[in-house]
């Protein structure tokens, strides 16, 4: 195991900056997930750690050693790519041992490591098969095994589940999580799927346009996003946003006016520092935190546009006339409502988020469980 530290790391191609002033501390044995939309620089960041991309400026440390100019083979890292990249003419055992043979490892060492890793990954009964005889999940396990036999200090995974169907992705997520718990290796995992990030990570790094938007534990990012980008990216369906105007402030409270015909006002338990009366801000509320109207004091009303019945839950898209946008309401039950009907939902102030015009969040003061 080894720690990974990035200090003011920047990557640029000419005048195009794809990673800017990245500062990260990844501890020994941590499972860290880089997540963000396409083009945010997450794979580039992983490739700089691996040594497949040069660092324009800043420093990279693996363990206590500066690695900027160290060749990839000498960094003690192993990498799994989105593509399995297996040799079709070689067996599972031969694919897994290929790197060790190139490195000149002794035959008994190779056999011992391959057999140990095959047991961990449940591949022992498949060692003599060729890749064409394997399922997609089995091929991905072989690709992971090929990296594991090299015994890297840091394990890098670049969107390893993207080529799998939904059921296999769930299965492989569970297997990767178990593998990390069993081996205790430092793992850095890249994905655009925030569900993978939330379920796998000890710590999530959210990237936006080449910068670190927020670093934290999954529930910290879910309940206390640092800005509107993180709030909208983490969570599915995404957070609802409403334009509001500040009408008053007090210690640890901000009063805002909702965009409804009755101009209803509500006090939100958020940090009021630097918030000015009259400022235009955004109120955020997650679909699952909206309430049935009969148990709430603050009511929003609109017309039902779409109803999605998922069996265990219902998602209702409601158009609020005064702002001409849809809110998503999610309830863990069957809700029978017709499209076109008028539907009222409740807004709990303690579950609301408030964002300034520049997108930064006013710190929520409501204590959430598990954080």
Swiss-Prot record:
What's any one GO cellular component for it? maltose transport complex
Gene Ontology molecular function: any one: ATP hydrolysis activity
Oligomer status and interactors: The complex is composed of two ATP-binding proteins (MalK), two transmembrane proteins (MalG and MalK) and a solute-binding protein (MalE).
As for what it does, the entry says: Part of the ABC transporter complex MalEFGK involved in maltose/maltodextrin import. Responsible for energy coupling to the transport system.
Q: What is this protein called?
A: Maltose/maltodextrin import ATP-binding protein MalK
In what way does this protein cross or attach to the membrane? Peripheral membrane protein
Q: Which gene encodes it?
A: malK
Keyword Translocase listed: yes
* Top EC class, one word: translocase
Known SMART domains for this protein? AAA
Boundaries of every ABC transporter domain copy: 4-234
Q: Which organism is it from?
A: Shigella flexneri
Q: Which Pfam families match?
A: ABC_tran, TOBE_2
Residues annotated for ATP binding in this entry: 36-43
